[in-house]
Each structure stands twice: as structure tokens, then as C-alpha cells.
Amino acid sequence: MADWNPSLYLQFDAERTRPAADLLSRIAHLQVEHVVDLGCGPGNSTRLLRAAWPLAAITGIDNSPAMLAQAAQALPDCEFIDADIARWRPAQPVDVIYANASLQWLADHETLFPHLVAQLAVNGTLAVQMPDNWQEPSHTLMRQVADEQGLPDRGRQPLLPPDAWYDMLTRQGCEVDIWRTTYFHPLASHQAISDWLQGTGLRPYLAGLDEQSRNAFLTRYVELLAEHYPLQCNGKVLLRFPRLFIVARKIDV
């Protein structure tokens, strides 16, 4: 798959950063020495972490060279590492592991989340936000277009139910807070929904397509979006975007 496009991703910087700030607001740590931002992207979430803990050592982890270059340019006082989140291990336990809209791309959460908790210091926090929109029209329509055009379903899998996360993390000695927030983003058009998702959810479907096939996919996708997202009185469309939040504090080892 082609590398991520930071410019495309940041076209919707405010909308993407808002849940990152909401997640950060629920972390109770006051004294933090080391923070890790898993899937840091272009550094929009890392910037919030630096503002919250100006004296902490902050490390951003991503596997996109383009995203890491953007983040390093924006935040020269943070460390950025090209690494696989599933295999990442810090040199010493971490106070806060923060993952905003990144872990949904990884498989086998039943193995991944206990692995991440194991990297926390006692009283450390794992803070995670993941899009929970697998059943939203924005995503069901991707699968519909792929099926219509004879393409494989390359989208990510649905998230586990909240009770599964709760049991998984409490078994790891964590105190767990889980909630779900639905954002309603006013966007300029149905094309804007497509533009947003070309930076994230549509990427696996578009990967490897030639220009003609890509254009056919996106044209059909926007047609279907228009059927499912009515225009508001001011001509905008409201993109419903549910997100799942998990904050787990490690209180036992």
C-alpha cells in the first residue's frame, strides 16, 4: 500500500484532533516522565501531549515515513521512531501509552492490548480512541462498491464489544473506563466525506487500483453517499462518526 499522505490527512485536522483532545482530557496523570504516542501520524496528537506534559520525554511511533517526517518537523523536541506497534517494546516502563485512531488498523487485539499493558509502569495509563463506524453508511458503502465492482473487501474488521474490552483489561490488572461518543461533523458536500475517508478508511480499497478503476470506485461511492446523507438546510451534510474510547490504568502487576 502507498505511504500515507500527511497533507490529505490534515485537510480535516480540526475534526481529527477533537477526539484526540477528548481522550487526553480523561487521563488523570499529573506527574509523567515518559509518554508514547502510538500511531502518531503527522504529530497532531503528539502536539497535544507536549502541551499537557512540557517536561516529559515524548516518543511518537508510526510506520509511515511521510507522517514521521511531518511530525519531526513540527515537534523537534520529541523523538519519532519508525516501528511496528504490535512488536514495539520500550527500554523501560512507560507512564502513558496514548493511541488516537491507530489501533483499529491492527489485528488480534486480544494479544495486542495485554502486550501494551505490559509496557506500562504501575499506575501507568493506556489511553485509546478508535473509530467505531464499521456499520455506518460511510463504511458499509465502501464494502458495497467493492462488491459491485468485483473487488475484495480490504476494509478493517469491526471492533470488539465494550464488555470484551473491559474483561480483557481488568484481567491485566487495570481499572477501566470505556465510553462511546458520536460526533456529527458538518461537511461541505458528499465529496468532502469521500475526501476525508480517502485519507483513512478508503485507503485499503484504493490501493493497487489503476486511475480508471480508482475513479470509478470513488464516483460510485459519492453517488451512494448522496443517497444516505441528506443535505441540511444550509447545503451541508452531517457525517455521523462514532468513536470508542478506552482509558485503562494499571493498578496491579
Swiss-Prot record:
Its EC number is 2.1.1.144. GO terms for biological process: methylation. It catalyses: trans-aconitate + S-adenosyl-L-methionine = (E)-3-(methoxycarbonyl)pent-2-enedioate + S-adenosyl-L-homocysteine. This is Trans-aconitate 2-methyltransferase. Keywords: Cytoplasm, Methyltransferase, S-adenosyl-L-methionine, Transferase. It comes from the Bacteria. It holds the Pfam family Methyltransf_23. One of its GO terms (molecular function) is trans-aconitate 2-methyltransferase activity. GO terms for cellular component: cytoplasm. The keyword Endoplasmic reticulum does not apply. Gene3D superfamilies: S-adenosyl-L-methionine-dependent methyltransferases (1.10.150.290), Vaccinia Virus protein VP39 (3.40.50.150). InterPro entries: SAM-dependent_MTases_sf, Trans-aconitate_MeTrfase, Trans_acon_MeTrfase_C. It is found in: Cytoplasm. Belongs to the methyltransferase superfamily. Tam family. Catalyzes the S-adenosylmethionine monomethyl esterification of trans-aconitate. Its main location: cytoplasm.
